[in-house]
């Protein structure tokens, strides 16, 4: 019987002046950008934490510290692919993932399918194994005031 594990991840980044955000590897036009060491992709960062947590491999900060200049402006899709390599080294593969983006703006619906496709490609799984959804906070809290964006992710991994 396969060893099955689950993990949860969460990430948040504040906004700064800018012209786009990157979520799920998709560049989305926006009046603001993420204030972050890497590209600030909270969706992928939450997913990395979920995968690493499921395998008991710590978190994204342990593997890709924001104090390391090598990760300045890093493409988070590259980080996600490295996390998948770490899982494979431990004898795990991704089963499925589910993520929620929490943002008042920009609108996510037009970009969800491209995000899913990117994530499925990076994870090495079928598209139907990746779900991404978005919600607002009804203008409550930091996300509602459009001060930043957050994301939650859960992942199931299994031994092979």
Swiss-Prot record:
UniProt KW keywords: Isoprene biosynthesis, Lyase, Metal-binding
Xref: InterPro entries: MECDP_synthase, MECDP_synthase_CS, MECDP_synthase_sf
GO biological process, one term: isopentenyl diphosphate biosynthetic process, methylerythritol 4-phosphate pathway
Enzyme Commission number: 4.6.1.12
The keyword Metal-binding is annotated on this UniProt entry: yes
Ligand binding (4-CDP-2-C-methyl-D-erythritol 2-phosphate): 11-13, 37-38, 59-61, 64-68, 103-109, 135-138, 142, 145
Swiss-Prot/TrEMBL catalytic activity: 4-CDP-2-C-methyl-D-erythritol 2-phosphate = 2-C-methyl-D-erythritol 2,4-cyclic diphosphate + CMP
The keyword Lyase appears for this protein: yes
Pathway the protein contributes to: Isoprenoid biosynthesis; isopentenyl diphosphate biosynthesis via DXP pathway; isopentenyl diphosphate from 1-deoxy-D-xylulose 5-phosphate: step 4/6
Cofactor note: Binds 1 divalent metal cation per subunit.
Catalytic EC class: lyase
Site positions for Transition state stabilizer: 37, 136
Binding-site positions, a divalent metal cation: 11, 13, 45
Cofactor: a divalent metal cation
Family indicated by similarity: Belongs to the IspF family.
NCBIfam families in UniProt: ispF
SUBUNIT field: Homotrimer.
Role this protein plays: Involved in the biosynthesis of isopentenyl diphosphate (IPP) and dimethylallyl diphosphate (DMAPP), two major building blocks of isoprenoid compounds. Catalyzes the conversion of 4-diphosphocytidyl-2-C-methyl-D-erythritol 2-phosphate (CDP-ME2P) to 2-C-methyl-D-erythritol 2,4-cyclodiphosphate (ME-CPP) with a corresponding release of cytidine 5-monophosphate (CMP).
Protein name: 2-C-methyl-D-erythritol 2,4-cyclodiphosphate synthase
Protein source organism: Thioalkalivibrio sulfidiphilus (strain HL-EbGR7)
Name of the coding gene: ispF
